[in-house]
């Protein structure tokens, strides 16, 4: 069933908003997936908090034309294309990597990952991107490192005090025994 101009304009607008809103965009070739596999993949993306949609290349290119700075993605809208939109660079890569390992299909293929202005279109990029830490993990590490010196200081101050307390207790015990 063909879509009318108004429906197509709405789709172009929706894709354009997402392309503009999300700093992380993955384009994949989903060719060769069964309906069940495709639905499974969509569910995995949804669980990870990643928006995933199949789109017509023509409509996606028209949406790209309206957005500044992401026109380099246009060449990757060829053949069957699905777009994953995310705030976290590692989540889509982890979903794809897990799916590829479990299904052993070699599909979907990563066409390109757009990570805040940088493009990764190397087949090995998926492994590298999947290993990236999330923003929350990085914040946790920074906080841990900032707190470590204070914890070491407290431990250092408590150590001699505890030794002195133990020594005084031993002396007191000896006096009681005498």
Swiss-Prot record:
SUPFAM superfamilies: Ribosomal protein L10-like. GO terms for molecular function: large ribosomal subunit rRNA binding; structural constituent of ribosome. Coiled coil: none annotated. Keywords: Ribonucleoprotein, Ribosomal protein, RNA-binding, rRNA-binding. The keyword Glycoprotein does not apply. Part of the ribosomal stalk of the 50S ribosomal subunit. The N-terminus interacts with L11 and the large rRNA to form the base of the stalk. The C-terminus forms an elongated spine to which L12 dimers bind in a sequential fashion forming a multimeric L10(L12)X complex. HAMAP family: Ribosomal_uL10. This is Large ribosomal subunit protein uL10. It comes from Salinibacter ruber (strain DSM 13855 / M31).
């Amino acid at each position: 069933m063909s879509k009318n101009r108004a429906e197509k304009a709405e789709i172009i607008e929706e894709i354009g908003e997402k392309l503009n809103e999300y700093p992380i965009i993955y384009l994949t070739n989903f060719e060769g997936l069964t309906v069940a596999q495709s639905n499974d993949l969509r569910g995995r993306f949804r669980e990870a908090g990643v928006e995933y949609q199949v789109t017509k290349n023509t409509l996606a290119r028209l949406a790209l034309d309206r957005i500044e700075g992401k026109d380099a993605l246009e060449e990757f809208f060829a053949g069957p294309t699905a777009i994953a939109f995310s705030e976290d660079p590692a989540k889509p890569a982890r979903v794809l990597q897990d799916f590829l390992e479990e299904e052993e299909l070699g599909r979907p293929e990563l066409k390109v990952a757009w990570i805040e202005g940088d493009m990764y279109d190397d087949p090995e990029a998926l492994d590298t991107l999947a290993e990236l830490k999330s923003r929350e993990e990085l914040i946790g590490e920074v906080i841990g490192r900032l707190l470590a010196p204070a914890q070491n200081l407290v431990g250092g101050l408590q150590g001699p005090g505890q030794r002195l307390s133990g020594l005084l207790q031993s002396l007191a015990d000896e006096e009681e025994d005498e």
